[in-house]
């Protein structure tokens, strides 16, 4: 019975420290392997139009970070793959499940991307399973990420269809309102859903949504994630593609969900919203701070690398980390 499993979210968990075995936090290794490739951090900026564009994708790839390019400028995807490969960089793109995407995937045989993410809101669907099989038939060497899902059954079905990784999270993101509009989702219990799904997984799990602090990255890894997709923490940078807005002398960046009317261009099946975030410096500074905080997490875990985070004990204390404070 589902109701027998513990239900909690990021703010309800504290990880319990172990004896530190490194002399400096800088010795902690935050690298992660996904498919045939190693990356500096187990984080992925969300593949959303206000988070990533081709310039940021190139920057991330050159600096050794993983990225997933969004699918909302469909005609630019093949030229993007070509441009990345000409620079000796990996190409990581997104596709949907509409009929014309099948022809697009087949057309990639001559210049095959290393990663393809099947990106739809409700990933436990026959349409996603069919697309996984099509990609694996046409492009067998491509690493396929599929999502989004929220149950062990979904993880097993997508893995059995050929997915190399599944993306877990239905509506926990800051600009996602799926749980309000539909009554469904993992909002409010995303970390427990991750734990539930990871126990069923044989391949990589990507936690997607609900990350509000850098410590949540360590918690995601503790509960089974190989990688963590993050939206709001990667939004609002000077180079972010979101529109810059000035309000009372302060600058803000637009940040909106992939299922918002601003993304769709129409008010139909809307499950996202738009917010303004204060502009917060450069993306590279955030990545550096994330790495330093994750190195500190590893030191508290008593290890030398990310694997040490998977074995720490934890306590569930409802809303304990804030204790009335804010950051």
Swiss-Prot record:
Gene3D superfamilies in UniProt: Aldolase class I
One Pfam family in the UniProt entry: IMPDH
Record-linked SMART domains: IMPDH
Residues annotated to bind NADP(+): 205-228
Keyword field contains Coiled coil: no
Catalytic residue list: 176
PROSITE patterns, per database record: IMP_DH_GMP_RED
E.C. number: 1.7.1.7
The UniProt record lists the keyword Cytoplasm: no
UniProt xrefs under InterPro entries: Aldolase_TIM, GMP_reductase, GuaC_type_2, IMP_DH/GMP_Rdtase_CS, IMP_DH_GMPRt
Cellular component terms per the entry's GO annotation: cytosol; GMP reductase complex
EC primary class: oxidoreductase
A single MF term (Gene Ontology): GMP reductase activity
UniProt-listed GO biological process terms: purine nucleotide metabolic process
S-S pairs: none
Catalytic activity, reaction form: IMP + NH4(+) + NADP(+) = GMP + NADPH + 2 H(+)
Keywords: NADP, Oxidoreductase
UniProt record similarity statement: Belongs to the IMPDH/GMPR family. GuaC type 2 subfamily.
Function statement: Catalyzes the irreversible NADPH-dependent deamination of GMP to IMP. It functions in the conversion of nucleobase, nucleoside and nucleotide derivatives of G to A nucleotides, and in maintaining the intracellular balance of A and G nucleotides.
Name by which UniProt lists this protein: GMP reductase
Organism: Streptococcus pyogenes serotype M5 (strain Manfredo)
Biological classification of the source: Bacteria, Bacillati, Bacillota, Bacilli, Lactobacillales
Gene name per UniProt: guaC
């Amino acid at each position: 019975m589902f109701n027998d499993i513990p239900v909690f979210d990021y703010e309800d968990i504290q990880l319990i420290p172990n004896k530190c075995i490194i002399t400096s936090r800088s010795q902690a290794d935050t690298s992660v392997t996904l498919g045939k490739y190693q990356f500096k951090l187990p984080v992925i900026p969300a593949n959303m139009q206000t988070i990533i564009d081709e310039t940021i994708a190139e920057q991330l790839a050159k600096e050794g970070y993983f990225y997933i390019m969004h699918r909302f400028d469909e005609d630019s995807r093949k030229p993007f793959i070509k441009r990345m490969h000409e620079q000796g960089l990996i190409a990581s793109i997104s596709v949907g499940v509409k009929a014309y995407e099948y022809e697009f995937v087949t057309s990639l045989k001559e210049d095959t991307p290393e990663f393809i993410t099947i990106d739809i809101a409700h990933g436990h669907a026959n349409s996603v399973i069919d697309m996984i099989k099509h990609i694996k038939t046409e492009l067998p060497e491509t690493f396929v990420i599929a999502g989004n899902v929220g149950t062990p059954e979904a993880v097993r079905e997508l893995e059995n269809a050929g997915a190399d990784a599944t993306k877990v999270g239905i509506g926990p993101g800051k600009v996602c309102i799926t749980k309000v509009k539909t009554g469904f989702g993992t909002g409010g219990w995303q970390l427990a859903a991750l734990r539930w799904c990871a126990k069923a997984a044989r391949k990589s799990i990507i936690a997607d949504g609900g990350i509000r602090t850098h410590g949540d990255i360590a918690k995601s890894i503790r509960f089974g994630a190989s990688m963590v997709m993050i939206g709001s923490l990667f939004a609002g940078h000077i180079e972010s593609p979101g529109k810059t807005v000035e309000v009372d002398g302060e600058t803000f960046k637009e940040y909106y969900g992939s299922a918002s009317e601003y993304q769709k261009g129409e008010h139909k099946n809307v499950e996202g919203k738009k917010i303004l975030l204060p502009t917060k410096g450069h993306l590279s500074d955030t990545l550096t701070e994330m790495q330093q905080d994750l190195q500190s997490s590893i030191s508290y875990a008593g290890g030398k690398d990310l694997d040490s985070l998977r074995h720490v004990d934890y306590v569930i204390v409802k809303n304990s980390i804030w204790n009335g404070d804010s950051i």
